[in-house]
């Protein structure tokens, strides 16, 4: 589960393995090993993934199945924009 979540979040963010490796200050082969499930990232890196991708560490670890957006790092304007987008998509989904 962890390996799939790391790969999925990286791909959804449009990052290559090399880009993620640079952001985490690790090698690309480390990222590749994590995504293949050959090795497991330390707790420190799980927390860094959560912060980088704005999700909970529980989601990354597979404890939660729903991806929840951590909005604590967004400012009020960004939160309002996210709220407006959710309302828009919810309204249009009903049609």
Indicate residue ranges for each PLM-predicted region.
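Interfacial/linker helices and their anchor residues that mediate assembly or domain coupling
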Residues: 64-95
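Helix-turn-helix-like N-terminal two-helix hairpins of bacterial/phage DNA-binding regulators
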Residues: 1-63
């Amino acid at each position: 589960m962890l390996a799939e979540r790391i790969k999925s979040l990286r791909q959804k963010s449009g990052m290559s393995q090399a880009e993620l490796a640079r952001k985490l200050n690790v090698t690309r082969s480390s990222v590749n090993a994590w995504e293949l499930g050959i090795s497991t990232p330390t707790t420190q890196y799980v927390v860094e993934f959560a912060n980088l991708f704005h999700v909970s560490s529980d989601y990354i670890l597979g404890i939660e199945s729903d991806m929840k957006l951590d909005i604590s790092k967004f400012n009020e304007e960004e939160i309002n924009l996210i709220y407006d987008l959710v309302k828009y998509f919810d309204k249009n989904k009903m049609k």
